[in-house]
A protein has these predicted regions:
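WD40-repeat beta-propeller superdomains and closely related acidic/aromatic-rich repeat-like regions
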Residues: 1-327
Length: 327
């Protein structure tokens, strides 16, 4: 695929599937990438070079920045680790009883949140760092998203739980996904009013947190990431969702290798990018919304791997025309 000034591939990509891409808290320059190749990598996307790589004992399933010089990660070895970019040091913070699937930082509550296949969410105090509580979930945690001081957790069995991070004594809301199939990804609106949820069956739901009936009336779901081939519809998992912090619009990435940008409030697709080499595994907008990181890798959902499986992270400069709601 030809590179354009608006889009290029990162040099030194991971050697195996990318599990997560995350931009630094205040930058469109630093990108954290976790991978099944047992590394966490830090890239400078402006100069297109890999600044640091932290080798791990097992595949890494998620990562996040805490601030501009520290990051966290977790994966199949069940250990939450923290990295200091200035000293190039790494330390273990604590453990789950099964692989860690999700790692997020909540700035409003100043906690690191991990979700695991052991059916718990744990909170970690980044100041010490140490465990600040363990909270049972109804099933394996597949995805979670921080929404202000609330936490939205998606588990197996299509369960959705809304927690208040300032008071984890009880679950604030228990919901069931409005999509019929397994939940793949949840991300919350930057305006904190709701969240977007995707499933393995080419659908996305836009949900609102306010339980009042008039607000709940606004929720809806739509089909996407489906391709007609020889009169048959092929339906693909929607693996990734990323929000534009400025415009409240969002991108979705599917196993069809396509990235779409949506205006969730006006129920419109704003644009669709060209097809990428393989499935879209993860997406992240920079804080100012000027750059979108797109991880493309083979995700073993098709029966046969392609002849060439290419792991790549594309950096795309996006503009208002692609990401801003049409007035």
């Amino acid at each position: 695929m030809a590179e354009t000034p608006s889009e290029f591939k990162l040099k030194n990509p991971p050697m195996d599937g990318v599990s997560a891409v995350k931009f630094g808290p205040n930058s469109s320059q630093h990108l954290l990438v976790s991978s099944w190749d047992c590394t966490v990598r830090l890239y400078d996307v402006i100069s297109n070079n890999m600044r640091l790589s932290f080798p791990q004992q097992a595949p890494v399933l998620d990562c996040c920045f805490h601030d501009s010089v520290r990051a966290y990660s977790g994966g199949l070895d069940k250990v939450l680790k923290t990295f200091d970019f200035n000293t190039n040091a790494e330390r273990s913070v604590g453990m789950h009883d099964a692989p860690i699937r999700c790692v997020e930082f909540c700035p409003d509550a100043n906690v690191i949140v991990t979700g695991s296949w052991d059916s718990t969410v744990k909170l970690w105090d980044p100041r010490t760092p140490c465990n600040a509580g363990t909270f049972s979930q109804p099933d394996k945690v597949y995805t979670l998203s921080v929404c202000g001081d609330r936490l939205i957790v998606g588990t197996a069995g299509r369960k959705i739980l809304v927690w208040d991070l300032r008071n984890m004594g009880y679950v604030q809301q228990r919901r069931e996904s409005s999509l019929k199939y397994q939940t793949r990804c949840i991300r919350s609106f930057p305006n904190k009013q709701g969240y977007v949820l995707s499933s393995i069956e080419g659908r996305v739901a836009v949900e609102y947190l306010d339980p009042s009936p008039e607000v709940q009336k606004k929720k809806y779901a739509f089909k996407c990431h489906r391709v007609k081939e020889q009169g048959k519809e092929k339906i693909y998992p929607v693996n990734a969702i990323a929000f534009h912090n400025v415009h409240n619009t969002f991108a979705t990435g599917g196993s069809d290798g396509i990235v779409n940008i949506w205006d969730g409030f006006n129920k419109k697709r704003l644009c669709q990018f060209h097809k990428y080499p393989t499935s879209i595994a993860s997406l992240a907008f920079s804080q100012d919304g000027s750059v979108l990181a797109i991880a493309s890798c083979f995700m073993y959902e098709q029966e046969e791997p392609p002849e060439v499986t290419e792991e790549a992270v594309f950096i795309r400069n996006v503009n208002d025309q692609e990401t801003k709601p049409k007035s």
